[in-house]
From Swiss-Prot:
All ranges on the Extracellular side of the membrane: 56-59
Main location: membrane
Native species: Methanocella arvoryzae (strain DSM 22066 / NBRC 105507 / MRE50)
Identification of the protein by name: Preprotein translocase subunit SecG
Keywords for the protein's UniProt record, in alphabetical order: Cell membrane, Membrane, Protein transport, Translocation, Transmembrane, Transmembrane helix, Transport
Superkingdom: Archaea
Amino acid sequence: MARRESSGGSGGLMSSAGLMRYFEAEESAIKIDPKTVIIAAVASGAFIWILNFTYGRFW
């Protein structure tokens, strides 16, 4: 039978360091409500559509 390798030692430290790095990045990230993003996208699309209707050509 094959021997099972132990996952102790540096494996746990690397895992913990990765989690700490993730949480540090999460704290410094800009937090925007998803509804705000959707509203901004719809407003931008409507604005571009109006500009295209006013100044652009129709296909």
